[in-house]
Amino acid sequence: MSDQLIIFDTTLRDGEQSPGASMTRDEKLRIARQLERLKVDVIEAGFAASSNGDFEAVKAIADVIKDSTICSLARANDRDISRAAEALRGANRARIHTFIATSALHMEKKLRMSPDEVLEQARLSVRFARNLCGDIEFSPEDGYRSDPDFLCRVLEAVIDEGATTLNIPDTVGYAIPELYGNFIRNLRERVPNSDKAIWSVHCHNDLGMAVANSLAGVKIGGARQVECTINGLGERAGNCSLEEVVMAVKTRRDYFGLDLRVDTSQIVPASRMVAQTTGFVVQPNKAVVGANAFAHASGIHQDGVLKARDTYEIMRAEDVGWSANKIVLGKLSGRNAFKQRLQDLGIALESEAEVNAAFMKFKDLADRKSEIFDEDILALVSDEQSDNQAEHYRLLALSQHSEMGERPHAEVAFAAGDVEHHARSDGNGPVDASIKAIESKVGTGAELLLYSVNAITSGSTESQGEVTVRLQLGGRIVNGVGADPDIVVASAKAYLAALNKLHSKAERVAAQG
């Protein structure tokens, strides 16, 4: 059995299924480039047959990413598989991931197919896919709740037809670690040709055990691929968290005995990028990537860490991308110092023009904020990369007036395509007034589901505010994120960012979990 663990990232497919986490083509491409820097083995770029937008995103990623295998999901039918193959045509290494449900509940209630019909559909789909691509992954949806005897028949059949990876999903997060690990092991032992494929795990977090179940599937079951997402992003309670699985295997190599290709120093930049793009803020106590992951408040702990870090730290913050350099930048810092901080933070901009634009934003921020921290730099770079996407709505100017005893009002100038709009409105506060001013011109009628503010850095009233806005329109939910030292400006940016996602909406068909 191989001692190499394959990391299969599905942030751009399964992660995006989280309500409000929809991403544009350019956002997906930007995250894919970061995943390549992270050195994940496989990037599931999307579900090419679900929409024209997803097809274009998969195609764009396949055309530019060279160091990771690019994968597209496809239902077990010729149309989906052909569409996936077409989108992946430019990939250096391509994989088609096809699936069909195998649990009695799904076959009867959703598919309305008999077990024999499902078995035949699985066989034919893998055979068809193998004629188009040499790397085929098969998933029995709701595999963990499937009858083991029937599941073994399906898995044996698809291996015979050319499946190279077998992925066993715990689609609804029902599994318990020991039981799931034994389930994978029993399948491997009972399927006669199991040695001809790599076994994979895909766990959801409904009971909070996605990471534990995945690791049990590896250690007990012998799986050699883990499907996961950055920050554990995903529908309902989320997916297995990439950063947690990777650091568990790396930190406890004495137990797992497995090697990883992942460059762990790129974990925090990837986490920050996904959080900023989707609007799903990372909780402070999140393992590995949370703001408090390496913080020590207890005096006893602080004393121990100062004397010897390994008294209370089992991994180093800098190993996962938290900078060990505590130098704070300011308005006198030059371009070279700024570029060095980008390098230290693992941020790779695509061109000198992007570096120059980010540096100009840095100087503008430094004029308004005396000290610039790493978190500020990560936020402004993400903001700059979003600006480069030629978005439909762009904030041009904003002013607001608020006095005690008077109703606040705001004036907003923004562009919608090539048209410049000026709007004025009052409101219950300056944020409310600003959003009402924008809405008076765009007239979407979108429902505001969420408005939240987080301080990007702590310990100062100068901290930038990061605002997340969640809108719903016609059954579609989107998030927008904006950052600025002025909370009102950050709020307007976030609202326009959400409107941009509504403007570029694309209908998608449902995928497996």
Swiss-Prot record:
Alphabetized UniProt keyword annotations: Amino-acid biosynthesis, Branched-chain amino acid biosynthesis, Cytoplasm, Leucine biosynthesis, Manganese, Metal-binding, Transferase
Subcellular localization: Cytoplasm
Query: Reaction catalysed?
Result: 3-methyl-2-oxobutanoate + acetyl-CoA + H2O = (2S)-2-isopropylmalate + CoA + H(+)
Q: Could you give one GO CC term from the UniProt record?
A: cytosol
Q: Where is this region: Regulatory domain?
A: 394-513
* GO terms, molecular function: 2-isopropylmalate synthase activity; acetyl-CoA C-acetyltransferase activity; manganese ion binding
Q: Where is the Pyruvate carboxyltransferase domain?
A: 5-268
Write the Enzyme Commission number(s) for this entry: 2.3.3.13
The main location class comes to: cytoplasm
The signal peptide annotation in the UniProt record is: none
GO biological process terms held by the UniProt record: L-leucine biosynthetic process
- Chain positions recorded as Mn(2+) binding sites: D14, H202, H204, N239
As cofactor, the record names:
Mn(2+)
One protein family per Pfam: HCS_D2
| Pathway field | Amino-acid biosynthesis; L-leucine biosynthesis; L-leucine from 3-methyl-2-oxobutanoate: step 1/4
> Taxonomically, which superkingdom?
Bacteria
Subunit structure and binding partners? Homodimer.
Family membership: Belongs to the alpha-IPM synthase/homocitrate synthase family. LeuA type 1 subfamily.
Give the NCBIfam families listed for this entry: leuA_bact (TIGR00973), PRK00915.1-3 (NF002086), PRK00915.1-4 (NF002087)
Q: What does this protein do?
A: Catalyzes the condensation of the acetyl group of acetyl-CoA with 3-methyl-2-oxobutanoate (2-ketoisovalerate) to form 3-carboxy-3-hydroxy-4-methylpentanoate (2-isopropylmalate).
Can you name this protein? 2-isopropylmalate synthase
Q: Which organism is it from?
A: Leptothrix cholodnii (strain ATCC 51168 / LMG 8142 / SP-6)
